[in-house]
Regions:
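A short acidic, Gly/Pro-enriched loop at the edge of an enzyme's catalytic core
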Residues: 128-138
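A short SAM/SAH-binding and catalytic strip from SAM-dependent methyltransferases
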Residues: 137-149
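Short alpha-helix
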Residues: 193-206
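A short glycine-rich, Lys/Arg-flanked "PGG" loop and its adjoining helix->strand segment in the class I
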Residues: 151-166
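Short, glycine-/aromatic-enriched active-site segment of Class I SAM-dependent methyltransferases
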Residues: 172-192
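N-terminal, positively charged/glycine-rich alpha-helical extensions of SAM-dependent methyltransferases
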Residues: 1-38
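Class I SAM-dependent methyltransferase SAM/SAH-binding core
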Residues: 69-73, 77-127
Length: 207
């Protein structure tokens, strides 16, 4: 029997030096001689492609508005959550598995006085109990492919989403088949626990 491809998420090469995020923030603050705006900090705290443009797209497509309750999965150091909260005055539950990233997210959110809008949660989305909270919107940027047990994940998200709620996900999919060794390498370097074709991805969402 083949060993599992899954690796601890802390082993990801992307996140071996989390201190750099705060160091970059402090350097930017020093160079500006003031606290940077959320737009100015977006090159640092948006850990996905297209920065706040992608967040604006999610706001538009999922109709995020004031007082909406939003779930952000794999929230990183909290960039999208802070931008969402500041722009829409929505309430964000930002779930991040890695404690080091979640700690930085909490510190930056405190700096921008957005604690009333954002709840930073260091937890596994597959295990966390939301105590019957229902979400108007679920968003995620480059995080879902890290999470194994796709069927379980989608069932959880379906049950968390309000009727007529919206979900927005920026994610990876396979454009062609890859070998077992390639999958193993992606799992080790990028914690890629679920990579499928676009067709399969869409079928999973429908089911």
């Amino acid at each position: 029997m083949k060993k599992s491809n899954m690796f601890k998420i802390e082993e990801m090469n992307l996140y071996k030096t989390t201190d750099r995020f705060l160091n970059n923030y402090k350097h930017l603050k020093k160079s500006l001689k003031r606290a940077p705006t959320l737009e100015e900090i977006s090159d640092i705290d948006q850990l996905h492609y297209n920065g706040i443009e992608a967040v604006n797209e999610a706001i538009l497509k999922t109709k995020i508005k004031e007082n909406n309750i939003v779930l952000d999965i794999g929230s990183g150091i909290g960039g999208p959550a802070r931008y969402l909260a500041n722009k829409t005055n929505s309430i964000i539950y930002a779930v991040e598995l890695q404690k080091s990233l979640n700690d930085i997210a909490s510190e930056l959110t405190h700096n921008y006085k957005l604690e009333k809008n954002i709840f930073h949660i260091n937890a596994d989305i597959l295990k966390y109990n939301f105590n019957k909270i229902k979400f108007n919107n679920i968003v995620s940027w480059l995080a879902l492919y890290h999470i194994p047990e796709r069927s379980k994940l989608l069932k959880i998200l379906y049950n968390l989403l309000e009727d007529k709620g919206y979900m927005y996900a920026e994610d990876f999919y396979l454009k062609k088949n890859i070998t077992y060794d390639e999958k193993k390498l992606l799992a080790k370097n990028f914690h890629a626990n679920h990579l499928v074709s676009l067709k399969t991805y869409k079928e999973e969402l429908k089911n």
